[in-house]
Amino acid sequence: MSEKRELILKYRNDVVNGKKLTRSTISELFNINNKFLLNLSDAANYITRHFHGSKVDIEELANIKKNFCSEDCTFCSQSAFFNTKITGYDLPPPEEIVEQALNAKNDGAGSFCLVAAWREPSILDFKKVCVIIEEINKKVGISVECSLGFLTDKQARTLKKLQVKRYNHNLETSRSKFPEICTTHTYDDRVKTLKIARNAGLELCTGGIIGLGETRKQREELILEISELEPEEVTVNMLVPMPGTPLELQTQLDITEILRVFSTLRFLLPKSIIKISGGREVNLKDDGQKLLLSGANGIISAGYLTMDGNAIKKDTEMINEINLEA
């Protein structure tokens, strides 16, 4: 056995035995030669099975307020800064979202995330979202998560009282790349909201988008920055270049770079859910199973914020084909 393979096995066993790896070790794993990527992937899968068994977490999203966002994130087709021809709408009546939540539960989703395209909720909109959450709790009984932009302490505490389990707020990219991606708020603004959510007792979901034109080093920075927040869930999106956005001509990442991210994340956060999110069908096509055997143990199914996705039935079949449990 080669020295590199032996090292991967050693680090795998260290993680299984509860040892936290150093930043230099993580860098060594993340930048390993392509010929050892399969070994890295297998080790990440071993860690996943050890801590999570064969269960794959399935989540559905509801885009409860679409388009016309005030922020200028260059990847986003919902930004008011860009002409993307995406049809927008404001908050729908609660019964519409309740019906979506019920369908998600009946489909087999374990959680249902309310997502809104705005910088932060207004007082009135936040009250409306709270009514939606209350109705879902009464009539559906599915785990509710939220992604509502920036939060105040009071809003975070209110969500906790409403039994919201987890709050999503992505870092989007590494600190060093962020100023190229967004100018209407800062990286620290995003970290602040995550800390507010944590202090209110909410679980955290954070992550980012890979393939924004960042370097491999910046992807490494991103996963280290994510791990410092110790989120219960990590969501990794792969850019789908959207017409009308500044990144519409961006080249997609090679599968080997995507594997690096998921596999190394598992060494960093062995007990967290690591979720394959937006861009899965476009970027991976039939390679989604590879990521579920390379550190990932969750997916978003049945569509995204402005794009269709696989039906849960199809995703469940995909999961079962590799002897995992949906």
What residue spans do the PLM features occupy?
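Auxiliary Fe-S-binding modules of radical SAM enzymes
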Residues: 1-35, 227-326
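Alpha-helix N-cap and loop-to-helix initiation/capping positions
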Residues: 3, 89-92, 124, 128, ...
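Catalytic cores of alpha/beta
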Residues: 152-159, 213-225, 282-294
